[in-house]
Amino acid sequence: MTAMPTPEENNELSTNTKKPIKHKKLIIVLSLILVFIIALVSSFFIMVKIGEIRLKNSLVSSVKVEGDSEEKFDVIYHNGKKYKYNENLINLLLIGVDADNKDKEYQGQADALYLVSIDTVKNKVKITGISRNTMCNFGMVGIDGEVYSTEYGQICLAFAYGNDDIQSSENCVNAVSDLLYGMPINGYYTLYLDAIAKLVDSVGGVEVSVDKNDVDTKFYTGNSKSLILDGKTAYSYIQARGNSNAPRVERHKKFITGFINSAKRSIAKDLTLPFKLANEMKKYSVTDIDITSAVYLATEAINWDIEFVNIKGEYGIEDGWETFTVDDADLKDVIIGNFYIEI
C-alpha cells in the first residue's frame, strides 16, 4: 500500500510545480517586450529611411536649367569638362523672416537666406549664404497664388510678394533656384524672428566669437574673444544691420555654427529634443518638410561636417537701398564646385 504524502511534501510539490509556470510567464513577458523593442527600433529606422527618400524625391523649385536639352538638372559642360549633378545631395532652403510672428498683416521680408546642401553619403553639409540684398528676378504672386509677372530687385522682397506664408516661401525658393541657374531645392523651412530666443534657450545658449566691430558694444566687454548668447542677446545679435548687411551675414554664420554645436550637445543628452523643438516651433515657422523627413534630418545632424560657402559680388546703392550683384563667373564656379561631380 502506497503511503500518502505528508502536508510538507504536498507544499514542496506545489511549489516545484508553480516555479516552471512562473518562469514560463516571465519568459513570455520578456519575449513580448523584446518584440516590442525590435518593432519600435525597426519602425524608427524605417521612418528615417522613408524621410530620406521623400526628401530626395521632393522638389519645390519649378525652375529649369537654362539651355538644358533634358528636363532633368543633370549633365553640364564647363571649361571643357563634363560634370554631373551630385544626386546624393538634399538641398533645403532656410528662410529667416524679419517679422515677429506669422499671424500678422505685414508679410515681412526674407532677411536671411541659406541653402543647406546635405551630402547623404559623405555626411557633409555645405551652407551657401545668399545676401538679402542680392539683385535677381522674382515672381509677383496674385491672389490666386499664380505668378503673373516678374520683378527685378532685392531677393528679400520675394517673400513680401506672396499672399501667405506658403506662397511667400515658395516664391523665395523659386527665386533662389533661378539665381543659382535652376538649382533643385527639395524643401524649405521658414522661421520668424521671435523664434530665435526660444531656440537659443532650448539648447542652453550659443557661443560665438566677437570683437568690438562685430556686435553691439553693450554685449562686448573687451575681456573675451567669445560670448555666450542667451535668447534675448541672440535676438539682438542676429538682427542688427547698421549701414550694411555684410557684417550681419558674417554674424549669422557664427550664430549658425554656434547653434549647431550647442544643439548637437543637447540632443546627445536628450534624444527627444528635436521633436520637442519641432512642436514648439510650429507657432513660429512654416515648412513643407514632413515628420518622417524631420526625423531623418534630426538623426543625421549629429554627424554632420559643416562648411560655409560664399558667393562673391559687388555692393552698391540704388535709390537709397543697398544692393549686391553676384559675380556670375564666381557663381558658376561655386555651383560646379559644390553641387557637381566631374565625369
Describe these PLM feature segments.
Residues 2-9, 13, 20, 30-31, ...:
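Non-catalytic, solvent-exposed segments at the cell envelope interface
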Residues 18-24:
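Membrane-interface anchoring determinants
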Residues 36-38:
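Hydrophobic core
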